[in-house]
């Protein structure tokens, strides 16, 4: 387990609720972070924004000896203490369980009973590039769920949980424990925790500039092309827009 990582404050998480994933992606690209968008991971409950800190869980292909390794007590007697339970117990308000299932969207990482623990821990949500069993039931808990799919199958014949709060991949991108996980209608973006505060103001300004462009071009009936890339005219209409907000 990683001993220490940057824990982004709840106040910063709250701020990102109103920032678009596309804007965050653009700001990260400027800094050389190109692989931060998860492939094949989509919301099972469209319309639910997700912002939270990653608690990571890694799955491996199943094998009998791995089953023996990860099951530490009382299997089948209510005391199955695998790493999946460790990950769920590690959650706190503002955290997101992020499970690396090697892109196996048809393989379950858990179902409605297991993932009820996310609700009782008051965590922010669930992200996995694997599948979610009983997905239609899990989304009734009300938290955001982003996954590679919904499936009726159980996972154990194919995968087993292996380790918690270590760097993982999910949807083909790196997720470090504590990274900020952002989910919207476009999918899931991973914001490195050390950059969360640094890029926030630039993200807000970018969204404001684009809103100013949209309002101006709609009002005047002109093409947005005159304001991209951002230029002196862009700055002019942005300042006018900003003044109207104050």
Regions found by a protein language model. Give the residues of each.
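N-terminal low-complexity or amphipathic/hydrophobic leaders
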Residues: 5-78
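Acidic/histidine-enriched, glycine/proline-rich intrinsically disordered or flexible terminal extensions
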Residues: 8, 220-246
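Buried hydrophobic positions in well-ordered alpha/beta secondary-structure cores of metabolic enzymes
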Residues: 28, 118, 179-181
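General beta-strand structural signal in soluble alpha/beta enzymes
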Residues: 36-39, 98-100, 126-130, 147, ...
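Short, charged beta->alpha transition segments
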Residues: 43, 77-90
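Extracellular/luminal Protease-associated
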Residues: 86-129
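A contiguous pocket-lining binding segment that forms or flanks enzyme active sites
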Residues: 128-129, 135-183
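A hydrophobic, small-residue-rich beta->alpha segment in the mid-to-C-terminal subdomain
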Residues: 180-221
């Amino acid at each position: 387990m990683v001993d220490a990582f940057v824990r982004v404050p709840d106040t910063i998480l709250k701020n990102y609720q109103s920032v678009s994933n596309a804007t965050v992606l653009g700001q990260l690209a400027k800094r050389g972070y190109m692989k931060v968008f998860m492939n094949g991971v989509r919301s099972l409950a469209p319309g639910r924004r997700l912002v939270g800190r990653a608690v990571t869980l890694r799955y491996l292909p199943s094998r009998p000896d791995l089953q023996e390794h990860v099951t530490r007590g009382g299997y089948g007697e209510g005391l199955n203490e695998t790493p999946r339970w460790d990950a769920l117990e590690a959650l706190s308000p503002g955290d997101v369980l992020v499970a690396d299932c090697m892109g196996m969207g048809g393989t379950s990482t858990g179902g409605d009973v297991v993932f009820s623990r996310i609700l009782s821990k008051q965590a922010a949500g669930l992200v996995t590039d694997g599948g979610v069993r009983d997905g239609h039931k899990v989304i009734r808990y009300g938290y955001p769920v982003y996954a590679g799919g919904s499936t009726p199958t159980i996972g154990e014949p194919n995968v087993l949980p292996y380790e918690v709060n270590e760097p993982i991949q999910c949807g083909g991108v790196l997720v470090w424990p504590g990274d900020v996980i952002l989910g919207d209608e476009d999918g899931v973006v991973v914001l490195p925790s050390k950059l969360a505060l640094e890029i926030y103001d630039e993200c807000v300004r970018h969204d404001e500039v684009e809103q100013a462009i949209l309002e101006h071009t709609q009002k005047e009936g002109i093409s947005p092309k005159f304001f991209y890339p951002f230029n002196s005219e862009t700055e002019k209409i942005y300042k006018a827009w900003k003044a109207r907000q104050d």
